[in-house]
Amino acid sequence: MMIKRSITTNMKALRLIQPHLLKTGSLRTDLLCTISSFFSSCERDFSSISNGNVCFRERLRSGIVDIKKDDAIALFQEMIRSRPLPSLVDFSRFFSAIARTKQFNLVLDFCKQLELNGIAHNIYTLNIMINCFCRCCKTCFAYSVLGKVMKLGYEPDTTTFNTLIKGLFLEGKVSEAVVLVDRMVENGCQPDVVTYNSIVNGICRSGDTSLALDLLRKMEERNVKADVFTYSTIIDSLCRDGCIDAAISLFKEMETKGIKSSVVTYNSLVRGLCKAGKWNDGALLLKDMVSREIVPNVITFNVLLDVFVKEGKLQEANELYKEMITRGISPNIITYNTLMDGYCMQNRLSEANNMLDLMVRNKCSPDIVTFTSLIKGYCMVKRVDDGMKVFRNISKRGLVANAVTYSILVQGFCQSGKIKLAEELFQEMVSHGVLPDVMTYGILLDGLCDNGKLEKALEIFEDLQKSKMDLGIVMYTTIIEGMCKGGKVEDAWNLFCSLPCKGVKPNVMTYTVMISGLCKKGSLSEANILLRKMEEDGNAPNDCTYNTLIRAHLRDGDLTASAKLIEEMKSCGFSADASSIKMVIDMLLSGELDKSFLDMLS
């Protein structure tokens, strides 16, 4: 009745202003738009009574999954136009559904429109806003909504705080998240296990396992019972830190408290034990897992396969793979990639290709890691052309080569002496928008130096120094070695001496390379001084360092210095390498040394 009265009034008003609107052409257009809009609104007013509420409520009841932006906007407009207005429960349900599709900014726009239409928020819609701001990494705005929550007289609940904590971790604000938990307690809002699990997970991801353990003890003090997720997260973090004993201790504590372990807990422990070389303990734990009727999953087997492959135990890996199939567990891309990498590392390329065929037959699509492993395998046996054929087929499968793929092939060409092809591939990499990293540049510079293109290497190195790329000691060592081999020992020495000013600390390899350069130049006294400086700087010489100096002194005819260095080398647990032994034998045969020197060397 009210709507009809409103329409009658509006019609009278329209008749009164009609003569004025028709005076100009532009206003005639406005009139047509106005009339059209007017009757559309009338139609909507009537339709909303009969169909509107039924329509959107039916949509909400049936569930909104993967709704597109335009459809969401249309549905929201329908809700806003409906009379009577939908309840805040309906709006909350709608906003939550849109948020689940990760259209967070759209939800925030809807919330703003809700306010503009004079519809007040409740704690549920405000919590949804906080969640959306947090998921967009805008916790500062989320805090402003929290202020609104309090201003409206609502009490922030654990959902509010849990959401804020997750948002802080998304932005890497670990300390702020921990402080927020304490603030919750101070404000009389008791954090629940979900709150603590969010904090523990975030802290462990940031690498601060000790802080996670402290938080576990705080949970006990505050009478919040930790669950399997809490313990499993910390156990996994301890295993990744190499603290296996502490992880086992926490595992036993968990069992004592009656918290049943999950397959995730066992997976972490098995991985940790195997990586620490405790094979028997890992096997026993696996048996314990099965005896407790906790079924190993594909991750369990992948963990064990990875360890076997990295240890070079490919036979054991194959047996484990067969066991996996027997148990009815389907291999995934990680399983196949791990085994393929193992075959390639042992130059068993035929078996690697068979595994590739098998994964395709089993409807498991190879990824870039799969083909990169195969390319690496070909390059390792100097079959870089075959590796290149695999590389050219990658794009046909809809895959894009990454920096690792290109780097492996560039290295393959460099090691095969095909430096021109290496340079061409490097240029192709850049032209295809794949940014070379430090590893790629290091490989290229090393290849250029080894293939007599020092000047080209220095040109690239100079450009890199001007860039913002963190070159690292490996890159500098490569160039210093290239300079020394190319007869630019003075330049190498100047670069070596400038390293501290660049904030780069020389390592054992850097010192050894520089000592070798000084020896080739005949500057043995400087090489000896650098040996002692190396020790003072906390870099203990290795077998390569000693053998380099021993051979230099032998060439110089200083047998006394050579003998002293041999004794020092042996006392450090090192022995002569093949080059040193050959030199001594040659000098022995030519009469420059007696047999006692060879005895001392062995």
Curated annotation (Swiss-Prot):
Stated family: Belongs to the PPR family. P subfamily.
Stretch forming the transit peptide: 1-95
Biological processes per GO annotation: mitochondrial mRNA 5'-end processing; mitochondrial mRNA modification
Keyword Repeat carried by entry: yes
Protein's cellular compartments: Mitochondrion
Protein name, UniProt field: Putative pentatricopeptide repeat-containing protein At1g12700, mitochondrial
Record PROSITE patterns: PPR
This protein's UniProt keywords: Mitochondrion, Repeat, Transit peptide
Gene3D superfamilies in the cross-refs: Tetratricopeptide repeat domain (1.25.40.10)
Gene Ontology CC, one term: mitochondrion
Organism: Arabidopsis thaliana (Mouse-ear cress)
Primary localization class, coarse: mitochondrion
UniProt PPR repeat ranges: 87-121, 122-156, 157-191, 192-226, 227-261, 262-296, 297-331, 332-366, 367-401, 402-436, 437-471, 472-506, 507-541, 542-576
